[in-house]
Amino acid sequence: MAKIDKARFWTGVLYPENMRPDWEEVIGDVLQNPYVYCKHTLDKDAKSEHRKDHVHLIVAFPNTTTYKHALKVMDLLSAEGKQAINTCQAVVGIRSMYDYLIHDTDTCRKQGKELYPPENRITGNNFDIGAYEQVGIA
């Protein structure tokens, strides 16, 4: 499978226990780019046991950027001496990934994943899903 090395939108999973304690208050200033995230606190594994709490994050860069840069930007949310994220991936379809934040996709429904309410998506720095969808179509 080919890996996408440059993209405008990047997503990753971060673990709160490794994030700076004030991350929710300073995320906009730290990332300095439009973002949306959803905290996953109700997910269960295949044995119906609670999965470790985590945060799904999408960052929108003004232009295409590299995997390495996107990962470094998201890693700024890590607590000192800790690593909250170890990998990220390019977003191929922004609407699909935006819906995945709350598990509102066909695949998530088939897998029986917990559906989070739309208001659990937290946006900042002028994240505008409608504008990004239009850019993707143009």
Residues of each region from the PLM?
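Catalytic "initiation/cleavage/transfer" segments centered on a nucleophilic residue
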Residues: 1-11, 15-24, 75-138
